[in-house]
Amino acid sequence: MWRWCLLLVLTLAAKAAGQMPSWFFAAEGLRTTEELDAYRNAGMSALWVQVNYRMDGDFSDYDALLDEADRMKFSYIVALDLRPPPMLRQTFRCAPHDPAYLVWLRRWLDTVIPHFRQRPNLLGYALGCEVDEAVSYDDEGFAFFLQSRYQSLEQLSKSWQLPVNSWLVPQAVAMQADDQQLPLQYGRPSLDAALYRWTTLHNLLTLWAQEVRRRDSNPQHLLFAGPLTTYRSLAVVPPDYQGIIPFLSPERAEADWLAHNCHAVAVARRGGRFIVIPMLTTRLKDGRIILPEALIRWSMAAIAVGARGVVFNDWSAINDLPAVRENVAALISRVQSEVPANASPVTRTAILYTPFGEGTLDAQGFPLYGFALLPGAQTQPLRLTWDEPASLFFSLRFNAWGTVDAITPFELTPEILSRYRVLFAPAAAYLEPAMQANLANFVASGGIVVADLGLGAFQAEAPFQTFPPTLRELFGLTVIRQLVVGPSVRTNMVVVRHHPLFPNIPEGFEIGNQVGSFGPVLGLMPAARAHYWALLTVARTGKRFVKQGGEVRALPGIPERAAVLINPYGRGYAIFASTFLWTLWSPKDLGFDLFHGSLIERGSALRVVGGFVTNVWVSAMDKGILVINPTDTLQSVRLLWRTPVFYALTNATVRPISTLPLVQEITLTLHPHDWAFLRPIADLSPPFEVTTEVKGRDSLKLRLGGALGGRVNVRFWLPSSAKSLQVVIEQNGTTPVSYTHLTLPTNREV
């Protein structure tokens, strides 16, 4: 009896959840049942249903829409705006420490969640909507934070090295205290203010997830955080969520009309920890509709860095213009048929992104990347890392070896670190002891990490000048004795010692440009255990007095250097630069490509033939290779791929370059704004030049180049859904052309 009841409950729970589409395509703004047919014809695979606060709790209009969606077998996400509605924003604050907000939130969720949770095709909930900008990072919350972090005012005063008489310290006052005592204008009080803002947003997102789960415990109903409109909010989403919806529109964030700030997807994935479905701009604020080729390019860029689909932010923009609607439908159909479900990028390089430095500000002065600054007018002048880490994301997101991942300090776990060979760590200021230990183990196991100024600042005794013991040992450092700060501080880097990590950078090579690629902060260090690889500047501070031949002589002080150091650690290397390395340094500068390329290629099997910056975007994925032409011109693409076996790839010609190791050359031609997914369809032994042309869903044509010198074994790779495969094999060479027609059941060798 009990066993039967349990099965019944489980069956009912399973029925009360929609199926996640293999590729999630949706558009915001669908309101009426009459549009559902057009919505389906546009290729959409799911519904995005925005539910705003209603005092009366009447959702009858949504019920009519979702009843029809259920009949048409559409799954849907219910997007809840959990910010206080405009009429109540003067009454309470959007903050986890505001009791009035908690009362309102719980009442609203008590109304909306029970209404929708039993719907049969509910995929889950999206919680958010420009939450970072709406959160009240107020000084009352800062006081609560300080009380929880420090046991007494005496401890707070000791940590800040300032007399503090009350917990009610305004953040601006705390940060101005740093301005008066530190050359970098950033010390312990400012670090605490930044950590407060970071923690507040994290706690609010955690609160939302927990409150929703209390009212809907069905684990098949996914929780998505978003749409989130700052990179720093993507980096603090807690593990209570299964997915994230980034919306970094070029209208509001960086004006990246080429790729719609697609690195937001990499940030949100956090090394594959979250499902990511970005929202894309479809209509501008002035009413203009985005061109179809831009929507196609943005969608494919997002998929290349790991998106599971996209949400278009305005359904009417798609529905109103036939050209847009038809192109979107064709794009979705092609993705669903050509790109395997759940295809994910595979890269051995990641950026360790700490949401600290300001990076870039939006038009209203809101920091997009880090919590170091107060939002709004108080952000000026910039006082920390300027354009870092934004500059690094843009420089590396599509390079000659493919894509890069992004992880936060909370992904510094053995499991996630095992996926990478190289970590670039701009301003890695927050590293708890366990994170430091995992980072050291990563390097000892053969990894390479590149860090710069600010390393471990939160955990250091003197931020930006000393280092926690584990990091000091890992990087072979001592101390930074002096910080040279100023807008005119600019210099280049001169290599003083050749190193095998950089085989193409000789001793004496100058990295930079005519005005200097490094600054405006330099940290001067005395001699360290790690080897100096390159020097930024050398200074002698003070004088030394020595006694020689009965006389006291004054000699120049001990030299202190701003430099890049390389420390061998276990089987790997830890590299440290005593400046904000990527504030000014870009791919346009001499040596940028040699430095980064030498490291990235160590873990990469794929490479685009050409320069560091390529005309095409390439993503090596676990089920093939995605190649995108974002330009207005025809592109001939040539790739080199190191693999254990020799593959025939759809849409490309493949020929062997070498056998030990096995390297194959892949060539194809892409029309403007076009893309191709190169899927392994067969492997050949021995390696032999082959061109594959897909003739239909279950039909292929293989053209073998050159004359056969013997037997060639071809093993076909077919999806499990394939019932049969018709193959035409054409042989070109000195003998007349011959054709072989085969009809194969799946998993057959010829």
Predicted regions and their residues:
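Boundary/entry segment of secreted carbohydrate-active catalytic domains
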Residues: 19-38
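The substrate-binding groove and active-site-proximal loops of carbohydrate-active enzymes
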Residues: 24-25, 48-57, 90-104, 128-133, ...
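Aromatic-lined substrate-binding rim segments of carbohydrate-active enzymes
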Residues: 35-42, 46-93, 208-209, 213
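Hydrophobic targeting/anchoring helices
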Residues: 89-93, 216, 222-391, 511-516, ...
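Polysaccharide-binding and catalytic clefts of secreted carbohydrate-active enzymes
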Residues: 95-99, 103, 107-259
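Extracellular ligand-binding/catalytic regions of CAZymes and related secreted enzymes
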Residues: 292, 318-346, 475, 539-700, ...
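A glycine-rich, often tryptophan-bearing local segment used as a flexible ligand/cofactor-contacting loop or short
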Residues: 429-510
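Conserved small/polar residues in nucleotide/adenosyl-binding loops
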Residues: 740-746
